[in-house]
Amino acid sequence: MTHYSDSKKSTQGPISKISSAMATTISPATKTYPLDLTNIPYATTSDLNNLSIHLPQAPVPEDPNRLFLIYIHGGAWRDPAILAPSFAATQSHLLNLTSNNPSTQDAISGIATINYRLSPYPAHPTNPSNPHDPSRNARHPDHINDVLAAILYLQETYAFGNRYVLIGHSCGATLALQVAMKRFWGSQYDPTSALELNVEPPIAVIGVSGIYDMPRLVDDNAAQPAYRDLVVNAMGSERKVWEDASPSSGDFEDGWEDGRLVVLVHSEADELVGLEQSEIMWKVFGEQGFGEEAGSQRRRKCIKLTDLKHDEIWEDGKKFAEVIAQTVDEIVRGEEKN
């Protein structure tokens, strides 16, 4: 982690809902699958409000037997070098894995990777942020509102409802669980509140190397000011905002009614985010009715890796892909039993 300058609070307005003219229309009769769609805008707010989609098969609206996978990248809310394409290696391994497992392969209706506005990073060595660039001057709740807008776009386009798995790495895991928290991130009467009202939370979340308790992250690394700088840069200086934005403060028992499975993945070799972040979240879910036993109606699962550093999990992608495939398979098998 590196030091960077604090920034003024974002003056960016609410998410602008993308017009119907910009929406992507998929006609199974005129498309060849698998199909890849890249840099699709889901809002007009900035150049980073886009997503990419891999469709292994023709989409079937409201298909009760398939799952959409949605990935949210990490990068400390600010790194322009870690965007949606960072999922490429994992996605490639995942497609290879599932090609040998027809039931899991058939269960995946699509894979989407989301970009969202970043917080300032004027000290970035090769791509410093410009204070006039709306894509590089975000402040909470801009990030989560972008993610909600992207999910809403996907739900309206492909009509999969809550049948999706939200996957996030590092601060992407923070954002994934913020979606499940089902909170109003802006003022109650702010137009962006419609996003929280209209987005259906996922049935499962996979959090990898996640930041789940921001005050604890800052306190545990008090000797390294870069951690505080990172949180202030993305969230502002008010500790109460950090607490409220932390998934560790979420009411998942009542707020995430459709949540059936949460998978917390962390490597003991992670040099940036300590294992205690996942341990905190594990305890939170346990206290809120998520069991450990296979077959539990609401389940929590912990996967500890031993040999991969923070970014190596997605750079290599093999073990990451295995976790995703196992999660999809577990959901499918659980539904078959019921």
Identify the meaning behind each predicted range.
Residues 48-50, 54-106:
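Short, surface-exposed "cap/lid" segments of acyl-processing enzymes
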Residues 134-158:
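Alpha/beta-hydrolase active-site loop
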Residues 149-220:
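Primarily recognizes the serine-hydrolase "nucleophile elbow" in alpha/beta-hydrolase
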